Amino acid sequence: MKTLRKTLALILSLVLALSVTGVCASAQDGGLKISVASDIHLSKVEKIDDRFKNGEYGNRGSLLSLSNEAFAVFDSFMQDSAAAGAKYIFLAGDLSNSGTAEQHSMISAYLEAFENETGIKVFVVPGNHDYYGLKTEPVETFRTLYKNFGFSDAYAVDEKTNSYAADLDGGYTLLAIDAIKPGNNDGEIGAELLSWIEAQAKAATARGRKLIGMMHHPVVAHFSMQEKMINDSLVKNWKTLATKFADLGIQYVFTGHKHSADIGKITSDAANVTFDIGVPSLLNYPLAYRFVSFLDNKVEVREKNVTSIKNPLLLPDGYNEEALLKVTTNTQEYAEEVFDFSLRDMFNRFMNADRLCKLIGKDDEGIKKVFETVCEKAKYLVDLPLYGEGETIETIAKKYNLTLPASSYKTGFELLSAIFKVYCAGDENFSSNSVEMQLGLRCIAILLNYSLEGTSSDTKVLFLKAMTAAFGGDIAGTSVALTAIVLKYGDDFGIEVVSAFLKPIMEDVLVDSAPGDRNVDLPAYYEIREGNEITKTLTFFEKITLFFLKIWNYIKGIFSAVKK
């Protein structure tokens, strides 16, 4: 019965897709249109977790995602892409959650039926999850299962990886790059694969083709401390690879893995540019994907969202009527609720002394004891009311001569959730003057005072040094400056201390740099620049100047706090 139900759901889904087939053919005016999704993490879920019946969400809390509803959300994305006139659909890795042959066969069967009915070609690359369950000959097995989704259209395939090159309409060529090492979450392009990429890129440009790249791991950092703060979030040796891509003419690369919408840019010494268009997870709030139009005079990048479930029969069993109505018709609100539920679970697991010590690479009992206290207090404070009398953050703040800026946020968790959602959605702009940054810095100052009250100056210095190590090690002079700050303020972590230490880091992550992340027009393709000594020298000095400005602003902020 269950198999029949799922088969019926698939048929109905494709019947709906047929209704948009005519749209696809007529919507190709206005350049090459490509719809791109990533990190779909599809798995077979027959029945939702029993916890749902108690008002909770039976989802994997660590992923902040609609894991139970994955297939239904994915189907809605495919239908929406067809209706919008996509010529091609790109899937940038982590198609499956566990990487089993069963999951891949299910996905492949759906894609086969979709292609046959709509005529829209689908191209895939593997992500780290896609090799998890393929224990025997994973590269070959993946290629066999997805042979019709890129490989059969390719004119060149790297046999040692699942990288391939395929010509698209409009004079474009796709370089699909498999930088995954099976059994490893890291992304890496070795010497042999890089040589293959270089050969394909040069051959394609010699034919007058314009290159579009796709791989799972980002190839450009989206903020300066990303490599240190988020383990395996970038392909190894990303900076060297990204500038190489730029000089090869790979001007646009679609990537996933980070589960957030970002567009990064890198410029080579020869003044060539690569844009890394980060594709968010389709299952995380706000259920977003990229819809990109490659035009003669520009590249239009637009964010689109799944707002409803097109085929409820693709959902698992177990919802009550109210929940089913929300899932299908108000999918965004449902996704936001799941996000909040999952974020709380993630926060509680992250606030663990052993985990934090491992994160910063410090196996030190002194640091561990400090972390234990901070984690315990953080879990308590995050749910206290921010404002009012009684046991509130505002009342505790007065004890340390701190005041909270007025805001509409009710708790620290509500603030944390709001910041995290905007970060995942893209175009984050929490500057130092924003109420979110001001309130967040004060909440952190309160946490540190509340947690480390009565501890010695040495303990405070130890804690701050540990935090410095977490963000890439000591910057010149910071150890001396941190000691001076703690000695000056004694038992109080004033807002000046926290601002001087954390504000540059938080702004680096939470203030988006150009170009925008969500809806932006990017430059059209241009001839590859060979570069000369003048352009190389200017680019070098520009990079050096920016680097030293960041260090100077950081140190200046710390010493200015000491002088106050």
Feature map (PLM): residue ranges:
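Non-catalytic terminal accessory segments
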Residues: 3, 26-30, 315-564
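Active-site glycine-centered loops adjacent to acidic/histidine catalytic or metal-binding residues
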Residues: 39, 93-94, 127-128, 216, ...
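Bacterial N-terminal signal peptides that target proteins for export
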Residues: 1-11
